[in-house]
Amino acid sequence: MIRSFKTLILLCLFNSILEAGSLTVMTLNVDNLFDTFDDQKKDDKAFLPIEKKNSETHVIQCNRIRVLKWRNECLYLDWNQETKNAKLTNLAKNIISYNQDGADVIALQEIENMYILNELFLLLKPYGYIDISLLESKDRRGIDTAFISKYEISNPKLHYIKFKSKNRDTRPIFEVDIRINNKVIKFYNLHFPSNFYPIDMRIDSLDVLNELIKKHNYPSVALGDFNISSKDDKKYQIYKNQEKYWYVGHRERCNACKGTYYYAGDKTWSYLDTILVEKNRNLHFINTSINVWRTPFNSYIKSGKPISFDPISNAGVSDHLAMVAKLKFN
């Protein structure tokens, strides 16, 4: 009996040591998380309470939007406190459903500002989260990348990309340091140009990322919305080409996964979102942990397609699914 008890203690200690050398990460494009205030420096006119949308100026600006869905959002979406709070609650529920208390480090895309990020943080704080980080970028729409972490975040930086083409995109790469078990890890949060823009802009963005990691020897993780469609990936072998520098999450192992985003137009799945771990820096995936995070409230059971947030029913989370993984120090 005593021997069995000692064995159990040793097993628990061994597991604790293993856990101490690992961390979990999540990346999620939250699909337009805005507050309810009108920020004159940002294009947030679609995400305002309906009573703020009655002016002639607002209607004229909305009618200039070419995409019907976005134009209707601008004109008719009632983004009030109740709707905003429902979106926050659903996001928090989605995040916490992973491992019952969320990943250690979360990279988020499409966050308007620190104010709304802090509201989400307050919902997550009881689950061990202690720090957040967001730097306001020059993005024309006013959506930024952000981190929420169970470890302290330091040295936040934005790296803007100079594109070879004439097209301009203002979303930078967001870099932070996070110290875990006395080791600094560089995290890079990405939201690359959308598929509206040519593929060379996403390739330029990856080139900038790869130059950044050459400037230091820290373990590095890059995660976020790469906006690389399955069509472009197949044609240009983009993710495969990154394996010179990185372990690419969904290429390492995600056998039962379809992708993180579903294109209804051509009925295809894509890994717009993924996680990269830099090679040869004593950090690697636990391959069996790599997954696209699905729950009954963030995706349809049969098809697996994401359930976007519906401001009428207040159901759903995002048009993207999160990718998650567990990482381990060598």
Ranges and model annotations:
Residues D44, I106, L134, K164, ...:
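Extracytoplasmic, non-cytosolic globular domains
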Residues V105-V184:
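Structured beta-strand-rich core segments of catalytic domains in phosphoester-bond hydrolases
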Residues M1-A20:
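Classical Sec-dependent N-terminal signal peptides that target proteins to the secretory pathway
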Residues V30-F34, I111-Y115, S137-R141, E152-S154, ...:
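Solvent-exposed loop/turn segments at secondary-structure junctions
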Residues C74-K84, D101-L108, L134-L135, K164, ...:
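Second-shell loop/turn segments in exported
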Residues L18-L123, S137:
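N-terminal, active-site-proximal structural segment of metallo-dependent hydrolase catalytic domains
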Residues T24, E211-V221, I228-N330:
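Metal-dependent phosphoester-hydrolase catalytic domains
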Residues K87, L91, N113-I116, D144, ...:
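Stable alpha-helical elements in mature extracytoplasmic
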